[in-house]
């Protein structure tokens, strides 16, 4: 690709656990979304969450990602999940108290297949910041986005506390603009680079 010819690596940002209610997928398979029977599904960010407890959904997600990875020279994937799961029900889980556990096992299954099929692919996971920062996710992705707060001074505290349990190499960070969009703090570019690295 042109990116590789420039000496860089190419990455894509995915949010594969979501579905838009106006999408072809949802129109053809509304049962793929998590929803409580007899209730209108709860939207967040104009999205519904796909039911990873459902084997068909896991296969669909894997096949879609595989199609992209097979037709592009992708080195890096950022796997994001930006909304809360509000309709906690799946007809594929006999004990609804196990819903979240089964959902995450479904996610692990997809990530396992991807990492086995594409061992050189770098995956960074993210969930509205660091909501999935745990050893289970690190098994499949050696980097996790720690927080959506990218102000370097704020990040010092976030990254310090994460370092009590996790290696620094697992903490993903970006260099942000100054003044920072959330805190309006101005910091030198060198500080922003030092904290992000």
Q: Each PLM stretch: what is its role?
A:
Residues 1-11, 17-24:
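Conserved structural scaffold segments of CAZyme catalytic domains across common CAZy folds
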Residues 6-10, 73-75, 118-121:
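Short, well-ordered coil/turn segments that N-cap beta-strands
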Residues 1, 31-33, 37, 91-103:
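Glycine-rich tight-turn/loop motif centered on a GG-T
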Residues 46-51, 87-98:
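Active-site-proximal beta-alpha loop/turn segments in soluble metabolic enzymes
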Residues 20-59, 104-197:
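Glycan-recognition surfaces
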Residues 2-5, 63, 67, 106-113:
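Alpha-helical scaffolding segments of alpha/beta enzyme cores, especially the outer helices
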Residues 50-80:
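An active-site-proximal structural segment forming one wall of the substrate-binding cleft
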Residues 10-14, 77-79, 124-125:
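Hydrophobic faces of well-ordered beta-strands that scaffold small-molecule active sites
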């Amino acid at each position: 690709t042109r990116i590789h010819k420039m000496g860089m690596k190419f990455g894509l940002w995915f949010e594969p656990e979501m579905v838009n209610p106006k999408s072809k997928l949802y129109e053809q398979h509304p049962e793929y979304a998590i929803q409580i029977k007899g209730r209108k599904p709860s939207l967040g960010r104009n999205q519904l969450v796909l039911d990873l407890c459902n084997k068909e959904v896991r296969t669909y997600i894997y096949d879609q990602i595989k199609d992209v990875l097979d037709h592009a020279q992708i080195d890096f994937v950022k796997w994001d999940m930006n909304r809360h799961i509000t309709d906690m029900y799946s007809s594929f889980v006999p004990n609804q108290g196990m819903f979240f556990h089964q959902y995450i096992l479904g996610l692990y299954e997809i990530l396992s297949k991807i990492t086995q099929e594409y061992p050189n692919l770098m995956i960074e996971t993210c969930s509205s910041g660091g909501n999935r920062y745990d050893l289970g996710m690190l098994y499949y992705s050696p980097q996790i986005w720690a927080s959506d707060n990218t102000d370097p001074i704020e990040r010092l505290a976030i990254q310090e506390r994460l370092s009590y349990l996790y290696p620094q190499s697992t903490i993903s960070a970006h260099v942000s603009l100054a003044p920072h969009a959330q805190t309006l703090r101005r910091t030198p570019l060198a500080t922003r680079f030092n904290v992000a690295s």
